[in-house]
Curated annotation (Swiss-Prot):
One of its GO terms (cellular component) is cytosol. Belongs to the DapA family. This is 4-hydroxy-tetrahydrodipicolinate synthase. The active site is at 136 (proton donor/acceptor), 164 (schiff-base intermediate with substrate). Catalyzes the condensation of (S)-aspartate-beta-semialdehyde [(S)-ASA] and pyruvate to 4-hydroxy-tetrahydrodipicolinate (HTPA). The gene is dapA. It is found in: Cytoplasm. Keywords: Amino-acid biosynthesis, Cytoplasm, Diaminopimelate biosynthesis, Lyase, Lysine biosynthesis, Schiff base. It holds the Pfam family DHDPS. InterPro entries: Aldolase_TIM (IPR013785), DapA (IPR005263), DapA-like (IPR002220), Schiff_base-form_aldolases_AS (IPR020625), Schiff_base-form_aldolases_CS (IPR020624). It comes from Actinobacillus pleuropneumoniae serotype 5b (strain L20). Pyruvate binds at residues 48, 206.
């Protein structure tokens, strides 16, 4: 089977801010960091990119700027999810001719639709564009679980090409592959189980850890996809503390602080209601960076 466009280590990119406003010069530097490190793709304005506290205009501008800075060297996946189908369609249409390689759309959050509601939500979005669509299932945040059976139904829609599964439940992977087909792209949304998912046939991971360990994550995924699991595991174990401790507080709070400590961004700040990493949690994240050999 040919290597899919969406594979390997795909960073769920932070959105750098200075005094509460998006810092586009730093965004350009982050994109360059990932291009040079060998990152296989960038998700722009997903959960880690603070999508919920950016306006639609800001969402679109950040994504378009990310495409501009990447200049065709790395595929950009636009975060276009919403818990209102109409808004998700608007955002998707605004980006249809922007140069993005595809869209990542989170399961509608808070309003807790049924499986049929989720199916119709994604069907409507997919029918509004020719862009490839990646489903995003993260029940811990949305309050709703997109079941494998529903994913299988959605896989019949031509431009729904894959899923980001952030449940961490590896038993779902073979079932999703069975229901959706072997060509349906499975991307782990859980760094701690990302390598294990690739051992089971997953194609990669949409990673938070990648923000601060881009070269290591790219190498780990390349080794795993080549079947060199022992070598990949050695890297994975060195990063395991980061995989866990970057979630010591709600993402992206810890990873922005970690990126700040490494000098990748000039401020660790986020937009309210998210706040900077608490002082009590900072030693834990610092220790994880040290274990990973990044400091």
């Amino acid at each position: 089977m040919a290597t899919p466009l969406f594979h390997g280590s795909i960073v769920a990119l932070v959105t750098p801010m200075t005094h509460g406003e998006v810092n586009y010069e730093e965004l350009k530097k982050l994109v360059e960091y990932h291009v040079q490190a060998g990152t296989h793709g960038i998700v722009s304005v997903g959960t880690t990119g603070e999508s919920t506290t950016l306006s639609i205009d800001e969402n679109v501008k950040v994504i378009k700027k990310t495409v501009e800075f990447a200049d065709g060297r790395i595929p950009i996946i636009a975060g276009t999810g919403s818990n209102a189908t109409s808004e998700a369609i608007i955002l998707t249409k605004l980006l249809t001719n922007s140069g993005v390689a595809g869209c990542l759309s989170v399961v509608p959050y808070y309003n807790k639709p049924t499986q049929e509601g989720m199916y119709l939500h994604y069907k409507a979005i997919a029918e509004s564009t020719d862009l490839p669509q990646i489903l995003y299932n993260v029940p811990s945040r949305t309050g709703s679980d997109l079941k494998p059976e529903t994913i299988g139904r959605l896989a019949e829609i031509p431009n729904i090409v894959g899923v980001k599964e952030a449940t961490g439940d590896l038993t779902r992977l073979p079932l999703i592959k069975k229901l959706a087909g072997e060509d349906f792209i499975f991307l782990s949304g859980d760094d701690a189980t990302g390598l294990e998912s690739m051992k089971l046939g997953g194609q990669g991971v949409i990673s938070v850890t990648n923000n601060v360990a881009a070269a290591d994550m790219a190498k780990m995924c390349e080794l795993a996809l080549a079947g060199k699991f022992d070598e990949a595991e050695a890297i994975n174990q060195r990063l395991m503390a980061l995989h866990h401790d970057l979630f010591i507080e709600a993402n992206p709070i810890p990873v922005k602080w970690a990126a700040y400590k490494l000098g990748l961004i000039s401020e660790p700040n986020l937009r309210l209601p998210l706040t900077t990493l608490s002082e009590s949690a900072q030693p834990t994240v610092l220790a994880a960076l040290q274990k990973a050999g990044l400091i």
